[in-house]
Amino acid sequence: LVLCYGGSGGSRKINDAMKLVVRNMVKDDVAFIFATGKSYYDEFISSIEDLNLKPYQRVVPYLEDMANALAASDLVIGSAGAISLAEITALGKPSIIIPKAYTAENHQEYNAKSIEKQGAGVAILEKNLTDVSLNDAVTRLLGNREELLEMANKSKEIGKPEAIDLIYDEILKIYNANNKEKLHKKESKKSKKEENTDTNVDLDKKEDTSSQGKVIGIKKK
């Protein structure tokens, strides 16, 4: 199963490149799910209306059950957002990553190149993305089960399926540290208050003693 999506809103560049890929996957009887994005759906469907899709070949505007689709996939095509890549690698999926251009500090390109460098996927920059370049990458990987399996293993190695537990532990650690600091400050304040109270009591005693009148004797003439 090939899963393709261009982020929650879709990607025109990916959609344009996928037209040839979808045609060839239909011809080769490959199972796929392609989420076009709601705003691009009608346009994409019009471009492939001559094709007869099988029940296991789906083009949808938006994928409601991404978790199960991702778990069932053998190859993922998508952008290089941090959350997407975390999900892909947590499940050990080989991927073709297409980083969006003009993202903050070009982080998607760095993400994609990191995945490729570690052997977990193939990176195709948006400026180099064409229907032919994407189709060639898909055809190569689907035709080479050994390479696909190797990528899956590498993806699993760099994935962090326990990430949510690590994040929870870190939050708990910070929370406990803050509480400990607050408690320490509270106890310190209480201690100072008690010291001030003791000091005031001592001063009051001194004032009471010093305010006692002296008996002045009257001399008889």
Regions flagged by a language model, labelled:
Residues K160-E194, G213-K221:
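C-terminal alpha-helical cap of glycosyltransferases
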Residues T130-G143, L172:
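Two-component system phosphotransfer/interaction surface
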Residues G78, P94-E105:
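Short hydrophobic beta-strand element within catalytic cores of glycosyltransferases
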Residues L1-V76, E109-K113, K117, I124-S133:
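Donor-nucleotide binding loops and adjacent catalytic segments primarily
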Residues E147-P161:
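A short, well-ordered alpha-helix in the C-terminal region of glycosyltransferases
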Residues S84, E105-A112:
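Short, glycine/polar-rich helix-capping loops at beta-to-alpha or helix-loop-helix junctions
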Residues Y62, A82, K100-A104, N128:
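Short, acidic/turn-prone active-site loops that include or flank metal/cofactor-
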Residues A71-A86, K93-P94:
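Acidic donor-binding loop of glycosyltransferase active sites
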